Amino acid sequence: MEGLTEGRLVHFVMPSHEHRPAIVVRVWDQLSGMVNLVVFTDGSNDVKKSEESYSRDPSPVLTLWETSRSYSEDPQPFTWHWIERA
C-alpha cells in the first residue's frame, strides 16, 4: 500500500462509526494494510465509564491501543482508512 509507514496519521473507525485520528506505530503487512495504531479518543465521550469507576479515577482515557487493524475503503468499525480531504 503506497504511503503506508510508521508515523502516518490515519482515521480509525470507532464502534459508534465515528472517526478518530490515529498514528500508525507498526506496519504488519504493507500489501493488505494491516497495522498497529494509537488512537486519540474524545476522552470520556468515547470511552464510557461506570459512575463507580469514575469516582475512583476521573481521568478520561485519551488513547487506545488497536492492534492488527485492517484497512477498509468502506469505513467499518475497527478498521482504518486514509483521512478524507476537507
Predicted regions and their residues:
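Short, well-ordered loop/turn sites that connect or cap secondary structure elements
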Residues: 3-4
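Basic/aromatic-rich interaction segments and small domains that mediate binding to polyanionic partners
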Residues: 9, 14-53
